[in-house]
Amino acid sequence: ESLIEAYREMLPDATETELAIELGTDFTFKIPAIRLAEDRVARGADTWVYQFDWESRNAHLKATHALEIPFAFNMLMATGVDAFIGKGELPQAVADEMHGVWTSFIQGDEPSWPKYDLEKRTVQHFDNNSSVVENGELPRLNAWEGIR
């Protein structure tokens, strides 16, 4: 089975453009980040993984690279951020949650979700309704096995 066929199975309603974006995102960001987490765990390092899923109201951006930065630093009101996150009510609850996790971690506290391990592969997903997911990316990881 080819990588593209695997993605078509995982995302049956995706257009060709959406499939290309998913493949590119995973190649550039997601798979390397997961491989780094796997390597850290294999070396005995405490590791937590998060994924920022809140989608910009700018339809072309979705949950694009670096969109989480104004949330992590609680800077949704900063000049120019609205161009990045889109117009409308500020998603302050998401920023409060993410900023709280980051500042607690900086101060030496552990995140509230379980550490990443090679069995459960726990990931915290930040969104309007944040959640903790186990093995959510396993089909993608399996598709990339031996490739990246």
Task: Label each residue range with its predicted role.
Residues 1-89, 101, 108:
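Substrate-gating cap/lid region and adjacent catalytic-acid/histidine neighborhood
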Residues 10, 122-123, 142:
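Small/flexible residues
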Residues 54, 102, 113-115, 144:
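Tryptophan-centered motif/residue detector
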Residues 92-95:
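Conserved loop-to-helix N-cap of the C-terminal "lid" that shapes the substrate pocket in Rossmann-like
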Residues 98:
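C-terminal catalytic lobe of FAD-dependent flavoproteins
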Residues 108-136:
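Mature extracytoplasmic/periplasmic domains
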Residues 131-148:
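Tryptophan-rich aromatic "cage" segments
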